[in-house]
């Protein structure tokens, strides 16, 4: 474990293995340790780097929501990779982590060798829809402020976006619940306000500038989220898109064996994607 200080904030970073670097970025309410089930296989072919985003795990939780912004954390991660001598790196991100990864690819293209986005969003361009999302995230943040982590997790786990997780084995669901409960309410509240989809600068018009070979992974049970993933893959020139059948918003949790195969294959691909794979069908 390493503490790396960037722009006044301290991040918890872990690395291991041997080979080309791969940065794995967790989702909201998660932490770098979420990727632990996949690390043994990855470390046979790569040097893995996991990080706790701000407000999560053992990284700092700045009180100012603006410090949690996707744009600032993407810049932080670019700096961390450079400090580690791990740039350019393959970058994998899930949900919030996918948004950070996508911003990293847009703003610091030389840092990202390859890009894997699981259940991504490029932000919300429509002002009305964006305002609606900001209001929804503020409601969740107020639950954290007023009622604490237990009430928030109860609400969070019953959101429609996570309905497909109910099919996971009870043991896995129990571990996931326990991990969510270990979060700090102030950190999650600041993250919601500063790094939520509504707070993020929309990237739609800039996706065509992403030159890194990209794999976009989603679950068809994610509904609108799956549609977003398809649209993002279509907008990135060197992208291919894959749906993991029977999964929703979190394919890496709902189908870990299939997702692990995708991850290892992603790391093994060092050449640009063939033309036939560049667009979703």
Describe these PLM feature segments:
Residues 247-260:
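Catalytic histidine-centered segment of alpha/beta-hydrolase-like enzymes
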Residues 9-62:
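Conserved HGGG/HGGXW glycine-rich cap/lid loop of the alpha/beta-hydrolase fold
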Residues 71-89:
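Conserved acidic catalytic loop of the alpha/beta-hydrolase fold
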Residues 210, 216-218:
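Short beta-strand/loop motif that positions the catalytic acidic residue
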Residues 106, 112-145:
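Flexible "cap/lid" loop of the alpha/beta hydrolase fold
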Residues 127-131, 143-206:
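Conserved alpha/beta-hydrolase catalytic His-Asp/Glu region
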Residues 93, 97, 101:
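Gly/Ala-rich beta-loop-alpha elbow adjacent to hydrolase catalytic centers
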Residues 223-228:
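Conserved alpha/beta-hydrolase "acid-adjacent" motif
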């Amino acid at each position: 474990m390493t503490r790396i200080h960037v722009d006044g904030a301290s991040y918890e970073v872990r690395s291991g293995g041997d080979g080309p670097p791969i940065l794995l970025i967790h989702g909201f309410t998660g932490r770098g340790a979420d990727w632990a089930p996949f690390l043994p296989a990855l470390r046979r072919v790569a040097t893995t780097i996991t990080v706790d985003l701000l407000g999560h795990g053992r990284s700092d939780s700045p009180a100012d929501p603006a410090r949690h912004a996707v744009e600032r954390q993407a810049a932080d991660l670019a700096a961390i990779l450079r400090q580690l001598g791990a740039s350019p790196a393959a970058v994998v991100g899930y949900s919030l982590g996918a948004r950070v990864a996508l911003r990293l690819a847009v703003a610091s293209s030389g840092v990202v060798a390859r890009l894997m986005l699981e259940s991504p969003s490029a932000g919300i361009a429509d002002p009305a829809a964006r305002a609606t999302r900001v209001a929804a995230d503020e409601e969740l943040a107020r639950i954290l402020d007023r009622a604490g982590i237990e009430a928030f997790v109860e609400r969070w786990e019953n959101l429609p976006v996570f309905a497909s997780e109910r099919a996971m084995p009870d043991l896995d669901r129990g571990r996931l619940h326990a991990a969510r409960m270990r979060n700090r309410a102030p950190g999650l509240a600041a993250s919601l306000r500063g790094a939520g989809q509504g707070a993020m600068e929309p990237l739609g018009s800039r996706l065509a500038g992403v030159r890194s070979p990209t794999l976009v992974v989603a679950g068809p049970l994610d509904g609108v989220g799956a549609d977003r993933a398809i649209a993002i893959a279509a907008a990135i020139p060197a992208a291919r898109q894959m749906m993991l059948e029977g999964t929703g918003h979190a394919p890496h949790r709902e189908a870990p064996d299939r997702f692990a195969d995708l991850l290892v294959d992603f790391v093994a691909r060092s050449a640009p994607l063939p033309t036939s794979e560049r667009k979703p069908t």
